[in-house]
């Protein structure tokens, strides 16, 4: 999270061990938008996990809005769709792209990320799928394998590999570029909640 007048970033975390189960966080995307407004943060990175195709199809079946559409409906949001850089991973990402397109959800306002699961060059099927997705999504990137993240998360960003840091910078720039194409550059300042008037009660007897 980053404030409009802050030079650095702030991290809101529970401080638990990397292998601990995640906290039960609110599923409604609007809750994260309200949190950003209350904190006065200009940019917020919310790390969530749900199966996009299953969510979209389930919401169509039961007539609900669904988490995926909720994220896309938020002002100035750029969803980052992640999948493993494997044959199964790109197939899942392709199914996601087709599902979003069928539901009229703007895939071009998304960034697709293929995460390498091992060192070395990505398989040919992965590279071919990434080429096809480039014409559909706002941007397609590949994040190299970094065993430090797998073992320790982001507790010490200074220990990330140089390739990993470059990939993170490229991802951040891709998100900003997609946002700029959708809403203009520069983006408007983050919304702030209206201040409540201070009411001081004086006198009177309590029942």
Where are these regions (language model features)?
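Structural motif
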Residues: 43-47, 80-82, 113
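Inter-motif core of Ras-like GTPase G domains
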Residues: 39-40, 56-87
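P-loop/Walker-type NTP enzyme "switch/lid" segment
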Residues: 1-63, 151-159
């Amino acid at each position: 999270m980053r404030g409009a007048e802050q030079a650095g970033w702030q991290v809101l975390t529970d401080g638990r061990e990397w292998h601990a189960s995640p906290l039960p966080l609110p599923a409604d995307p609007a809750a994260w938008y309200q949190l950003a407004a209350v904190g006065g943060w200009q940019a917020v990175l919310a790390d969530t996990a749900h199966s996009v195709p299953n969510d979209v199809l389930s919401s169509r079946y039961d007539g609900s809005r669904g988490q995926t559409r909720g994220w896309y409906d938020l002002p100035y949001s750029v969803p980052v769709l992640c999948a493993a850089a494997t044959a199964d991973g790109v197939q899942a990402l392709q199914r996601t792209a087709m599902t979003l397109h069928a539901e009229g959800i703007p895939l071009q306002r998304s960034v697709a990320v293929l995460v390498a699961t091992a060192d070395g060059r990505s398989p040919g099927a992965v590279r071919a799928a990434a080429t096809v997705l480039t014409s559909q999504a706002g941007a397609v990137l590949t994040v190299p394998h970094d065993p430090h993240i797998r073992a320790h998360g982001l507790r010490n960003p200074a220990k990330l590999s140089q390739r990993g840091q470059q990939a993170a910078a490229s991802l951040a720039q891709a998100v900003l570029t997609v946002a700029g194409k959708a809403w203009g550059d520069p983006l408007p300042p983050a919304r702030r909640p209206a201040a409540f008037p201070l009411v001081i009660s004086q006198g009177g007897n309590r029942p």
